[in-house]
Amino acid sequence: YLVAGADIIETNTFSSTSVSMADYHVQEYVREINLAAVRLAREVADEFTALTPDKPRFVAGSIGPTNKTCSMSPDVNNPAFRALTYDELAAAYREQIEAMLEAGVDALLIETIFDTLNAKAAIYAAEQAMEAIGVRVPLMLSVTVSDIGGRTLSGQTLEAFLASVQHADIFSVGLNCSFGARQLKPFLEQLAARAPYYISAYPNAGLPNSLGTYDQTPAEMADEIREYVHEGQIGRAH
C-alpha cells in the first residue's frame, strides 16, 4: 500500500476485540494482538516517512464491527433478545483502543459500520480511552450500506446515521465495502452534501460473481475511484 502511494495504512486489527476473538478462544490476547499490530504498521509507516519526509505516512487503528450487535437479535424467534449489552461492547472496544493508543496510532478508524448502536459504543470507548491515556487522535468513521436504497443492515439511512453521531468529535465519515465504486457514488454524494466532515471511500471491487471472484480489473476500479476525486465526492464536505 505504501509503495503504491498510500498516505494512511490500517492496522491488522479489524476483529481484534475480546467479543470477536472469543469465538477462537484467544480473547485473553487482545491487548497483545493490538499492540503488535500497531507496532508493525508504525514501523513500516515511519520507514517510508523517513525516505520522503515531505510526505508523512500515518497509521489508522482499524476498529471493525463485532460478531454480536446491540440492535439486532440473533434469535429470529425472540426479536427482543440481544447477545450482549452496550456496556459490554464498549468495554471490549475500550480494551482494544487503549492498546492502539499506547502503541502509537495516528488515528482511530471505526469501519464497516452496519449497526449504529455498535458504532456509538465504539465512539464512547474511544473518547474514554483517549481521556484515560491522555492522547487525542482523529476519529474516523466508515459506514457500509447493505442495499441500493442506501440503508445500513440495521435499517438506518445515511442521513439518520449522521444525526445519530453528530454529538461526537469526528474527523471524517465515509463509506467502505458495500457495492462497487460506481454504485457507491450516489451515497457519497449524499454524505458530501450533509456531513460537516472530511469524506472518505474505499469500496469493494464490485460484487463477486457466482464463483466468488471479482470480474472488475484494477485499472477499471482505479478509473472509477479517480472520478471521486475529480468530481469532489471525497475530501472536504460541501
Regions found by a protein language model. Name each.
Residues L2-R236:
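Domain-level signal for soluble alpha/beta catalytic cores
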